[in-house]
Amino acid sequence: MSCCTMDAESVLALSTTSFSAEEVRLASQPLGEGLRQLDLSVSDVHCGGCISTIERALLTLPFVKTARVNLTARRVTCVYQEEIEARATDPSKILGEINSAGYRAHLFTPSAPESDKTRNQLLLAIGVSGFAAPNIMLLSVSVWSGADAATRDMFHWISAMIAAPALVYAGRFFFKSAWNALRHGRTNMDVPISVTVSLSYAVSLWETVHHGEHAWFDASVSLLFFLLIGRTLDHIMREKARAAINGLARLAPRGALLINPDGSRRYIAVEEIAAGDEISIAAGERVPVDGIVVSGESDLDLSIVTGESSPVTVASDSEVSSGAMNLTGSLVLRATRIAKNSLLSEIIGLMEAAEGGRARYRRIADRAATLYSPVVHLLALVSFLAWGFLGGDWKQAMLVAVAVLIITCPCALGLAVPVVQVVAAGELFRKGIMVKDGSALERLAETDTVAFDKTGTLTMGSSRLVRVDAMDESAAAIARGLAAHSRHPLSRALVRDTETAPISFDRVTEIPGGGLEARNGADIYRLGNAAFACGTSFVPRTADSPFSEVVLSKNGVDLARFFFDDTLRPGACEAIDRLDAAGLETLIVSGDRQTVVDNTAHALGIDRALGSLTPKQKVEECQRLNGEGRRVLMVGDGINDAPALAAAHVSMAPATASDIGRQAADLVFFIDRLDAVPEAIAVARRSASLIRQNFALAIGYNVLAVPIAIAGLATPLIAAVAMSTSSIIVVTNALRLNGFGKRPDMHIRRGIGRSAEVKAA
């Protein structure tokens, strides 16, 4: 129900903002085959009517191939031809066409997120209308109770003075939107709302001036109060969807140390890095752009790229991607891509594309709303004319028309979905699950396939020592003494999971990409990967093993081998059982090695497991399933899962996930147990049932109430009471969801079988 608004500053900008064709062409990106993509920011896009208006306007340009509006990002993505019949096209016309449609467009540039002023304004408007409505109602009670004429007139004037500023301040969202739509030859949901509120106040003021017995100031203010609640909920939930992309953008480094050809170094912004530039990356810094290692050796956290739970060693000629964290040594990197074409930018683009796809759910509702507006106006007009010409009482005709407009106000319809979402979100929160996206529950109820990431989702994401093959009794003590000097995940797991008292070393050196080295007299001890500890001729045992291996050596001869795996998340087995029992298909999509993924799938009884997937391949798998008509719930935790979380029909992440993973997900569960997934699906299905009931109640109310209003049997006051009552009924029905989890018959059937204690080993 959110619609277009424009202020005077925006209107002025339409006539002053201009870009040359060359500026626009430089701001767009080549796609090949003579096509370019242009991204534009359009801040005043708010509803499905805005989307269809802009897209239709752009597609009238002969050189525009596709146009898509992302409602969440308030961005327009346009693909256009560079040439038509050997003549260059003018892409600046794209901005002009958007401006002509009544919207302010400018070239998109990433920037830090600003505070949500619209949300604050909406909350303040709710407070103003919420203060005015009950106070006017209290005055109305005295009038209804039979106050004398002088007291009645005084109360009416007081009500008028309270209602006027409330209507001006709280109603400006609807009035501006309605005016903007009408002056461009369109209607939207705010048009009948604005007409209803204005007519109700005008008729009430007329009655007050002429000492009438009744006034309906409370009706107009109450309408605004209920409608603003629905609009605010919609706005808050939509803006939360942007948090993931903002967080991912903050992950990218802002600058890098450039190595000049003469060997000197200077710090430059990431945007200034060109392909072929050499940059220095110290330990603890993130890789700013995609590139190839020129010199140096280090361990990188590549979780953003592959989802690997363990750091990966890189050396000369290794390819690295932007966003990876350099853990140990210094590197010199030759850039192969500029920042806007790097992996991080690609992930952000994938997430925005997925969010744009979600807008179709809102479009369906807004398209229905475009039909509602003219029908309501026509109904009120016909009622007015019929009563005026047939009855001859034009005052009564006006009251009937106002009553029809009030009684058909979409308050109940507007609250049918958001109120259930809020109650369901509260119920899930009590279960340790947070809902972040307004449409997430609706989409979760439609789920028929659940795709899990492995590391950090099905498992806890922390390494666990599972086996030690020692050739020397003191090996564990030596290894623990060495491992205590490193923050490597496997070193920490070794220290945590061994109980032997460590042997102390005076000096321990950490070799980037290799491991730890220490001397004890004439002996050299090494702990790390096989090649580092024993030389390149040593053959590790992890090639086809589900375990990670660390080798301890003395003077190049192995003393012990330590094997690590990941622990299954508590409740993982029960969760898979319950999902299977509910008829949902389960699969694993992971960046880990296929052998490791297969091992976890076998432990959980999951038939389909895909390993060694990149973020893009995870997205493609979700899209493939969507193409087959499946409704995919993606459950993941890593930064590399963020695009798939955004591309899936709906997504969940544990609270232990990366910041980006949590922000990209529609739902986040704070409990350690994985049975939060079937719990959430159970509540979502129940809430979907209540939403359908609320729609039935709201439609049933209109079917019964509209004929009564047309017949003149309902005054504007009665119409306002009926409208409020319908809203209360809808809210009360939604509250039935409270305590849902306490009724065992509502739960997804629990599977019987494997114990939660089954391990991944």
Swiss-Prot record:
A metal cation binds at C47, C50. Its main location: membrane. GO terms for molecular function: ATP binding; ATP hydrolysis activity; ATPase-coupled monoatomic cation transmembrane transporter activity; metal ion binding; P-type ion transporter activity. PROSITE patterns: ATPASE_E1_E2, HMA_1, HMA_2. PANTHER family: P-TYPE CATION-TRANSPORTING ATPASE. Residues 36-106 form the HMA domain. This is Nitrogen fixation protein FixI. Its EC number is 7.2.2.-. It is found in: Cell membrane. Mg(2+) binds at D637, D641. Residues 143-155, 206-217, 391-395, 712-716 are extracellular. The keyword Chloroplast does not apply. It is an enzyme of class 7 (translocase). It is a multi-pass membrane protein. FixI is a pump of a specific cation involved in symbiotic nitrogen fixation. The four proteins FixG, FixH, FixI, and FixS may participate in a membrane-bound complex coupling the FixI cation pump with a redox process catalyzed by FixG. The chain crosses the membrane at residues 121-142, 156-177, 185-205, 218-238, 368-390, 396-415, 692-711, 717-735. Belongs to the cation transport ATPase (P-type) (TC 3.A.3) family. Type IB subfamily. GO terms for cellular component: plasma membrane. The active site is at D453 (4-aspartylphosphate intermediate). Keywords: ATP-binding, Cell membrane, Magnesium, Membrane, Metal-binding, Nitrogen fixation, Nucleotide-binding, Phosphoprotein, Translocase, Transmembrane, Transmembrane helix. Residues 1-120, 178-184, 239-367, 416-691, 736-761 are cytoplasmic. One of its GO terms (biological process) is nitrogen fixation. It catalyses: ATP + H2O = ADP + phosphate + H(+).
